[in-house]
Amino acid sequence: MNRTSARPAGPRTALMVVADTAAAASSGVDEGADLIDLTGAVPAEVAAFRQAHPGVPVCADADTDAYGGPAGLTRDPAVAAASGARLICARQEEAARSGLPPERLLIETSPAGLVAALAGGYPVLVDLTGTGTGAGPGRTSPDSGTSPGEAAIPGDGPPGAAALAVAALSGWLGAAVVRTLHPQPVRRALDLTDSVRGVRPPARTVRGLA
């Protein structure tokens, strides 16, 4: 028996792309992003993207009303609950203190912490950029192409084989969201994994009669 077949089917892994402008965020959507991380963008860029793509969820620092959301969104879980937002927490203790149900939370982790994070029972966001709160000091970023025995790709080069393998493995193990700087190749890796898991519908169904 192939033990990998025991991976239970579940929801597809969502792709979050980091962007700092509305144009870059829109490009990410075109390349397969399900969510956009605009925490580094100015409010005007966030507003422009939301106007252009009202149905795409946005990750933003929302402690003020500058983003068109309620003030205190991340400081007061009750505000988050009333707004319908999901909170991203760096530690499971924070998630437990929030009082929100698991489906309204995401635990952010680096690839190295994925298995431990999944054991907590909360949906997990895997950060491949190395810049998130779950990355930890001194850890390398798979998105940069850095891994043991592999040199980093300078600048904004595409992710290496190690990064795509980490993305695929994250989806296979059950990560709810994968965050990346490179949407198109990571989307392909996640789609391949979801197809193997049996949770990605075919692009076209063809039926014929003999």
Annotated model-derived regions:
Residues N2-E31, P43-A210:
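Active-site-adjacent loop and "lid" segments of alpha/beta metabolic enzymes
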